[in-house]
């Protein structure tokens, strides 16, 4: 009789286990999709936050440069059309503007390629500004910030580059200066990305931003700022053909690991991305699956025990019937 009870309990539990497994698989598939969608949504929001930080950074610097340009152009043309005039009437303003905005350097590149500049070297000489040019084997007219500002006749921002003094990424923002139809020169500021990097260090996720030359200039992961340490060409090339905020997967060349990414263009010259290992993205999904498996096992164990006692109770009359039948046939 105990054998019958056990077999009935096992058969009932086997049916229950099959049902639970089917239900668990179906639930897991729906939960996996839901969780993955939420993870992608969160990663996309990280990129949007990074994009906003970059836009604010450029907007602030562009506005500051335009404000200085307006201030410079308030002077009559005779106070701007020569190096001596610039040094006399504008030089000190460059120093004041640089200190107020914490810029690396502020300068005017003249049509002859010479600079009137306020920078760390002028600070070292304990002067507000200095000249820099042919005597130093430098010609502003050969530099991209000058060429592009003159060619486009509007504000221009260079790709990021490493400042030799601070060894940190920086940009040059430049704009042409015209007074009464006369070209005065190109006004420019060199801007360190320290403020932008400080913002990124408080952002969630592994977000970073790079320029047209695939140089990372701000990142929540500081190792990405070390030039040559990581090759971002794989993610950069895919980002060019993907829509903004379109999730995709790529293989990192350094270790062959599969990774998940979401990217977006910023001003059509920068790209903001978030890149995470696939395992990290899928971790919440498999955590749910593990919890479900544990729950199924616990339910099965308890159901076996419970069904055994239930079957024992409801099959107990069979023992009396069996005894009666045995006695009856013995009597016959």
Question: Which residues does each predicted region cover?
Answer:
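Cytoplasm-proximal transmembrane signaling helix
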Residues: 13, 17, 209, 271-323, ...
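Extracellular/periplasmic juxtamembrane segments that couple receptor/chemosensory ectodomains to their
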Residues: 213, 222-223, 229-291
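Juxtamembrane interface helices immediately C-terminal to a transmembrane segment
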Residues: 9, 27-57, 61, 78-82, ...
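Extracytoplasmic/periplasmic sensory segments of membrane signal-transduction proteins
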Residues: 41-49, 57-154
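Extracytoplasmic/periplasmic ligand-binding sensor regions of membrane-associated signaling proteins
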Residues: 99, 118-191, 196-199, 252
């Amino acid at each position: 009789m105990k054998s019958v009870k056990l077999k009935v309990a096992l058969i009932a539990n086997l049916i229950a286990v099959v049902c639970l497994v089917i239900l668990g698989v179906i639930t897991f598939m729906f939960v996996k999709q839901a969780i993955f969608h939420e993870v992608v949504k969160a990663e996309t929001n990280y990129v949007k936050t990074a994009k906003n930080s970059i836009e604010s950074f450029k907007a602030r610097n562009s506005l500051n440069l335009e404000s200085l340009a307006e201030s410079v152009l308030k002077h009559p043309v005779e106070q701007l059309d020569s190096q001596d005039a610039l040094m006399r009437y504008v030089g000190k303003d460059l120093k004041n503007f640089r200190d107020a905005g914490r810029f690396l350097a502020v300068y005017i590149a003249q049509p002859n390629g010479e600079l009137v500049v306020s920078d760390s070297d002028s600070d070292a000489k304990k002067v507000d500004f200095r000249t820099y040019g042919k005597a130093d084997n430098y010609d502003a007219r050969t530099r991209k910030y000058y060429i592009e500002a003159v060619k486009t006749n509007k504000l221009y921002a260079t790709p990021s580059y490493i400042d030799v003094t601070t060894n940190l990424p920086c940009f040059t923002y430049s704009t042409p200066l015209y007074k009464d139809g006369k070209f005065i020169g190109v006004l420019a500021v060199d801007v360190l990305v320290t403020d932008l990097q400080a913002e990124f260090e408080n952002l969630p996720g592994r977000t970073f931003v790079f320029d047209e030359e695939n140089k990372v200039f701000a990142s929540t992961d500081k190792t990405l700022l070390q030039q040559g340490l990581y090759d971002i060409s794989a993610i950069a090339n895919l980002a060019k053909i993907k829509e903004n905020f379109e999730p995709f997967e790529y293989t990192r060349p350094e270790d062959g690991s599969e990774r998940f990414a979401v990217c977006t263009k910023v001003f059509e010259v920068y790209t903001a991305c978030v890149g995470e290992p696939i395992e990290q993205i899928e971790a919440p999904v498999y955590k749910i699956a593990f919890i479900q498996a544990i729950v199924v096992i616990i339910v099965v164990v308890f159901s076996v025990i419970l069904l055994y006692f239930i079957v024992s109770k409801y099959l107990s009359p069979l023992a009396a019937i069996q005894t009666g039948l045995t006695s009856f046939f013995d009597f016959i």
